[in-house]
């Protein structure tokens, strides 16, 4: 009888140990973070942080210069800035649109600056392609390079930002004297697109206002 009791107690202890071990394994499986003490846990959020980062206005102006600064654009952008400033400061009826988008308001002026810059670069065979070009067969051979496509898309983004900034900075009032606009627009565009000191003829620094996104 005594022997049977010892066997029974031993069996119960064995079963209890097995149950406890199983429960411990289940806890570790349900909480991998607690079971990762012997290895470095992988942070998927940090790993994916650099994937598909969109270019922001601030990054485009200040830190991503090398990403789009190709000779293809830089060769003509200073010349085109001067030409565009003259074009958008005049009284060309093509740039006076109804609905508050004329060149006497910042939004209309920024549209004029961007469209005129796009046309000027195109005239110099440095055309800005549409970032959503459609079939690959429609893309000219000279811009089939993937790297050039990336540079072009980024350049368009920066240029759109800079035309808005320059329009907001230079067109301080609806009745601003258009004769003084070219002297402001040209340097403002150049300084915004290429802040590097050797990118254009140095001049007094401009304090640009905060970027305003128009709906």
From Swiss-Prot:
UniProt entry keywords in alphabetical sequence: Membrane, Nodulation, Signal
Source organism superkingdom: Eukaryota
Compartment(s) where it occurs, according to its Swiss-Prot or TrEMBL record: Symbiosome, Peribacteroid membrane; Symbiosome, Peribacteroid space
Any one Gene Ontology cellular component term annotated for this protein: peribacteroid fluid
Keyword match Membrane: yes
Keyword Zinc: no
Induction description: During nodulation in legume roots after Rhizobium infection.
Pfam families: Nodulin
GO biological process: nodulation
Family: Belongs to the nodulin 20 family.
Entry protein name: Nodulin-22
Organism: Glycine max (Soybean)
Taxonomic lineage of the native organism: Eukaryota, Viridiplantae, Streptophyta, Embryophyta, Tracheophyta
